[in-house]
Amino acid sequence: YYLATVEGNQPRVRPFGTAHIFEGKLYIQTGKVKDVSKQLHANPKAEICAFKSGEWIRVAGELVEDDRVEARQSMLDAYPSLQKMYAADDGNTEVFYFKNATATISAFTHEPEVITF
């Protein structure tokens, strides 16, 4: 999927790989040293977009940092390959969850399905 953030008045989009449900919330992960982290702290509004088998999904909302070790560890457990670069207590690993979010699932063959969470 792709994650879009804002830097000043400029949109920034990049491919992302982590998406994890923890405690019923949709989480993503990054490192505090990355530009995406700085952008989300300055403006938490973000959107992800993915495409598969003729359908696409857009999830728009606010990404809120969860600074608990348990949340970071849950993400790392879901993505073991990340443990080569990150640790839950390394001071760099950061997880965010979607708040006030709307997911829209679309295709050319059906009306959009909208889910809020």
Task: Describe each model-derived feature in a short phrase.
Residues 58-117:
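Charged, gly/pro-rich active-site loop segments
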